[in-house]
Amino acid sequence: MNQAFLPFSRPSIGEEEIAAVEQVLRSGWITTGPKNQELEQQFAERVGARHAVALSSATGAMHITLLALGIGPGDEVITPSQTWVSTANMICLLGATPVFVDVDPDTLMSDAATIEAAITPRTKAIIPVHYAGAAFDLDPLYALADKHGIAVIEDAAHAAGTTYRGRAIGARGTAIFSFHAIKNMTCAEGAMFVSDDEALANRVRMLKFHGLGVDAYDRLTHGRKPQAQVIEPGFKYNLADMNAAIALVQLQRLDEINAKREVLAKAYLQRLEGLPVQPLLLPQYPQQHAWHLFILRIDAERCGLDREAFMKGLQEQNIGTGIHFIATHLHTYYRQRFPEVQLPHTEWNSARLCSIPLFPDMTLDDVERVTGAIANLLD
């Protein structure tokens, strides 16, 4: 008899999150309001950030952060290609040019030396990615950025709960976290911008809501006139309180959620030892992994089958998988626009990486099921 389908990810939503949404629905104020303010305050306190702005998506957050930094035509922004396409999309939509850099073949994160080689007089920002829950090596990067006077935007979409040398990601500089449905903490769709730069945070807050500088709840609670003034044209990237209410509960549960992920990940590492599936390696510097993803590299020469056959084999056993990610520069638009870009480590991994199930409501029996299925496929 076939076992039930095991997805590669599933949000951990319980009665507390459902009750929090119900409370907002009954309150009479369901869009951006007090729950947003509470979420911003609690998130900033947790990571040690001076400023926090809740937003409707990490893509929207990246868009207006780049805009707030003045990124535009003629500018270059350095980013790994081995990441989700939204980063490069936002750079291009602002008229700037993404400059793709290669990554370490086994952590899938770049480093300061590789990034420095890509800097030109047109470089205006660097976007390091904390990949799969591991922390980027930040100290050399910030030293490099300070030396050249270049802004840093940490892509912390995978890094809720990640620490680097004892400090939470988001404790310095500027970072963007994602609360998408598969992330370690979720509210279906949402994000948090954090920064120690007050002027930048104020501009992001203004740009997120039409460039008004205030939202409807501000006008209600502070008695402002219904029609606030546009300071500069902005967007509609505010987060609804229904989503913020879920995120508040998830934030309180984050340590518990990440601890469960770590138990599962360590069980995977133990049970997969000796198999030719090449999990990502942990960085050698001090960091606390959030275990957002558990990624294997399925190389046909080592495994006896390619990634597509591997994923199909698991699917036939009702086990879901994912690909995180097809390298950005290999997508049709970017391949046509930047045909000269060659990133050997990125391209090797992009053709082989595969995410296997990892979410907090999994059990060790689920891990046993997945690893047993993998062993059978490779036998």
Swiss-Prot record:
Record's catalysed reaction(s): UDP-4-amino-4-deoxy-beta-L-arabinose + 2-oxoglutarate = UDP-beta-L-threo-pentopyranos-4-ulose + L-glutamate
Keyword NAD: no
Enzyme class: transferase
Keyword annotations of the record: Aminotransferase, Antibiotic resistance, Lipid A biosynthesis, Lipid biosynthesis, Lipid metabolism, Lipopolysaccharide biosynthesis, Pyridoxal phosphate, Transferase
Top-rank taxon, per record: Bacteria
Pathway the protein takes part in: Nucleotide-sugar biosynthesis; UDP-4-deoxy-4-formamido-beta-L-arabinose biosynthesis; UDP-4-deoxy-4-formamido-beta-L-arabinose from UDP-alpha-D-glucuronate: step 2/3; Bacterial outer membrane biogenesis; lipopolysaccharide biosynthesis
Gene Ontology BP term (one): lipid A biosynthetic process
Family, as annotated: Belongs to the DegT/DnrJ/EryC1 family. ArnB subfamily.
HAMAP family named among the record's database cross-references: ArnB_transfer
Subunit field text: Homodimer.
UniProt name for this protein: UDP-4-amino-4-deoxy-L-arabinose--oxoglutarate aminotransferase
Source species: Pseudomonas fluorescens (strain ATCC BAA-477 / NRRL B-23932 / Pf-5)
Organism lineage: Bacteria, Pseudomonadati, Pseudomonadota, Gammaproteobacteria, Pseudomonadales
